[in-house]
Curated annotation (Swiss-Prot):
Coiled coil: none
A single BP term in Gene Ontology: ectoderm and mesoderm interaction
Gene: sna
Species annotation: Drosophila melanogaster (Fruit fly)
Cellular location(s): Nucleus
InterPro entries: Snail/Krueppel_Znf, Znf_C2H2_sf, Znf_C2H2_type
Region (Disordered): 29-65, 162-191
Pfam family, one: zf-C2H2
Zinc finger (C2H2-type): 245-267, 280-302, 306-328, 334-356, 362-385
Keywords: Developmental protein, DNA-binding, Metal-binding, Nucleus, Repeat, Zinc, Zinc-finger
Residue span of region SNAG domain: 1-20
Protein name as annotated: Protein snail
Similarity-based family: Belongs to the snail C2H2-type zinc-finger protein family.
């Protein structure tokens, strides 16, 4: 009996799907059934036989931990081999080839640093291996810094018996209780101050250190200078390169010859040119000037290069000619703000504005009467003033 879903919402009504089966051959049906059986997930509830489990199980290869001796340089001797025996793996581990060694961050390139196979060491290869997985300071200590042989290596301090457990972060112990058996705490390398920092110094040979007076000699016979000396020397070299011109009188330095010549001409008090001023005389009237520029401006008063095109009158300055041309055109652009009068020149407007103030610019010393122009004051002093000038 079909259910009635008339009152049920559309999104909750079931969908009726009718599968149309097509006729197929017997061979095709068998192939489809076999593929369907392979696609089905494995039933884990069924127990398999013990022989099937042993066939699927593969025993993983045991991992062995190795502690590397980083305290020695790549040049091995009898003393280094005796010290490395303290940190070497067990005897049975020596049967493994170097390519079978599994360690954190190390590959088959660690042939020179495994204590199991003492082979010839390539310093560049070993330095790359140390920088890749272990300790870059120990690798670069002897390979690239041959002058630091007198200083203690950071790896030697870490590989010492007191701090042998400092490698726990790199290689864990073989058993969980090995740390508790010794009863010693790992050494904190952040508070050590006996490890020198070669990056803060510039190393030099003995021949170079003898020529440098600011170098400091160490107990090992090599000398070093602080890094600030190189920067200060470069600054001094740049300063000497930029300021090449020097005044012989006051020892001041200038970057250009023009600056030095102007200093000698105007500013230097020890120069003879400033002690006895050179004078330039006018050929027309004989006036003397201290600078050539002032003499050229004076010569224009004799030549009068600015001429009026209307009346032919000449002037020494172009702005004087411009004010003269306004007298021909009748233009008066400067107007008085207090009265309706206007003027062709700005100087005439300023003189006119003195008539509107109570105290003028020019005053008589006898009667204290003030005037807007100097010409009016002179006219008053000669005729109108009743008190004679003593």
């Amino acid at each position: 009996m079909a259910a009635n879903y008339k009152s049920c919402p559309l999104k909750k009504r079931p969908i009726v799907f009718v599968e149309e089966r097509l006729p197929q051959t017997e061979a095709l049906a068998l192939t489809k059934d076999s593929q369907f059986a392979q696609d089905q997930p494995q039933d884990l509830s069924l127990k398999r036989g013990r022989d099937e489990e042993t066939q699927d199980y593969q025993q993983p290869e045991p991992k062995r931990d190795y502690v590397l001796n980083l305290s020695k340089t790549p040049e091995r001797n009898s003393s280094s081999s005796s010290n490395s025996c303290l940190l070497s793996p067990p005897v049975e581990a020596q049967d493994y080839l170097p390519t079978e060694i599994h360690m954190r961050g190390l590959t088959a390139g660690t042939t020179g640093y495994t204590t199991a196979t003492p082979t010839t060491i390539n310093p560049f290869q070993s330095a790359f291996v140390m920088a890749a997985g272990c300790n870059p300071i120990s690798a670069l200590w002897s390979s690239y810094q041959p002058h630091l042989a007198a200083f203690p290596s950071p790896a030697s301090s870490m590989a010492s018996p007191q701090s042998v457990y400092s490698y726990q972060q790199m290689t864990p112990p073989s058993s969980p209780g090995s740390d508790l058996e010794t009863g010693s705490e790992p050494e904190d390398l952040s508070v050590r101050n006996d490890i020198p920092l070669p990056a803060l110094f510039h190393l030099f040979d003995e021949a170079k250190s003898s020529s440098s007076g600011a170098s400091v000699s160490s107990s090992s016979g090599y000398s070093y200078t602080p890094a600030m000396s190189a920067s200060s020397a470069s600054v001094a070299a740049n300063h000497a390169k930029n300021y090449r011109f020097k005044c012989d009188e006051c020892q001041k330095m200038y970057s250009t010859s023009m600056g030095l010549s102007k200093h000698r001409q105007f500013h230097c008090p020890a120069a003879e040119c400033n002690q006895e001023k050179k004078t330039h005389s006018c050929e027309e009237c004989g006036k003397l000037y201290t600078t050539i520029g002032a003499l050229k401006m004076h010569i224009r008063t004799h030549t009068l290069p600015c001429k009026c095109p209307i009346c032919g009158k000449a002037f020494s300055r172009p702005w004087l000619l411009q004010g003269h041309i306004r007298t021909h055109t009748g233009e008066k652009p400067f107007q008085c703000p207090d009265c309706p009068r206007s003027f062709a020149d700005r100087s005439n407007l300023r003189a006119h504005q003195q008539t509107h103030v109570d105290v003028k610019k020019y005053a008589c010393q006898v009667c204290h009467k003030s005037f807007s122009r100097m010409s009016l004051l002179n006219k008053h002093s000669s005729s109108n003033c009743t008190i004679t000038i003593a």
